[in-house]
């Protein structure tokens, strides 16, 4: 079961529906370009990045900001374990590395530690996954700026995430940002259309010895909003349950749990979960114009604009041709309706 494997893909043969994006990303990386992959969760950013790295055959390390939101610590530990980078044992100090990597280190020595390790790393791609959850944006940008200026010819970053938290400061650095003026290429990864989604479901079900007709495929695509991660999860469940309706029910149940965790993460970031939730509750009832949301929420123009911007960057809402905002993810809408 390859297409319906729920882990991020690393073999380009099983990266469905992203051929153009893969070729573009590979071309950028060959040029040593630093890349930012933007898009909502479950869109396939990690798989795209890993497959591009595989295609090139470069060595790589991965930092998952969901597991550790301290960028310095994660980068140093990943480099320490990178094969051929710097061969030391945990809890042992090495010459010219004035810090014990098994415990805390101080900021003054971090640049020296990185310098020693990066010099030994060789040609390397660093994948920073879901970077919006990293803390201390300025410190992250300082380290990225240092690596960019010093090791651009050998160290390349691929950074994935949605446009919240530290990602916003990386994508749109202000004039006072350490990253200001550095050339970093942005790629936005979009949802699949119906034809691609149904084609994926048909190919995946054929692989596991099951069938999928267009009508059922279209229903699943609409319920799961063309997000590859949700469609893959459906396929995984379908391969085990054998019943498409039961598999869809189970997938939606699991997807709502993921949304719940995302909402908690938004709260942990301190970017206004209560007000964001209030906006989503209104939009879960019906699409609304900005002026209608002003009336229903009672927020000031500036406050509403700020939170609308956050929701758009998260990929949670969008504006339609009637200039009305609506929740773009049906899973999110269902979750909001069930958790008023």
Q: Which residue ranges define each predicted feature?
A:
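A short, basic N-terminal segment
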Residues: 1-35, 40, 165, 331-340
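P-loop NTPase nucleotide-binding core
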Residues: 31-125, 131-134
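Alpha-helical DNA-recognition elements
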Residues: 55, 237, 310-314
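Sensor-1/coupling segment of RecA-like P-loop NTPase cores
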Residues: 133-134, 146-176
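Amphipathic alpha-helical "lid/sensor" segments that cap RecA-like P-loop NTPase cores
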Residues: 203-261
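C-terminal leucine-rich, beta-strand-based interaction scaffolds used for sensing/assembly
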Residues: 266, 272-340
